[in-house]
Regions:
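Intrinsic disorder/low-complexity segments in short proteins, especially the signal peptide
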Residues: 20-23, 52
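A sequence-composition feature that detects small, non-aromatic residues
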Residues: 11, 22-23, 38, 43
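A short, surface-exposed loop/turn module that caps and links secondary-structure elements
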Residues: 32-57
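Enriched for short, Lys/Arg-rich terminal
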Residues: 1-4, 9, 13-17, 24, ...
Length: 91
């Protein structure tokens, strides 16, 4: 069951700020490795805490992709993309 990958406006802006090779790596990873899985939770790690408790993260090198997995609509909504040192701040 293929999943649809969607990006929020802020995630799209963050993707544009990355250099081209890193942005392509993130897009390829999400489409080719995560989107094709029957259960995308098997490749990620769930986040904890009051603000990010329902989100999942995926590692792409030093970058982190924060997602909301919506089972009812079979959609993986990418919330945030950033360096591992900065992506969790402010959430």
């Amino acid at each position: 069951m293929p999943w649809t990958i969607k990006y929020t406006e802020s995630a799209q802006c963050q993707l544009k700020k990355l250099d081209k090779s890193a942005a392509l790596r993130v897009l390829d990873y999400m489409d080719e490795r995560i989107g094709i899985l029957a259960d995308p939770r098997s490749a990620g790690k769930n986040l904890v805490g009051p603000r990010m408790g329902s989100y999942w993260r995926y590692r792409v090198g030093d970058l982190r992709v924060i997602c909301d997995i919506q089972d009812q609509t079979v959609v993986i909504l990418v919330i945030e993309i950033g360096h591992r040192r900065e992506v969790y701040r402010g959430r």
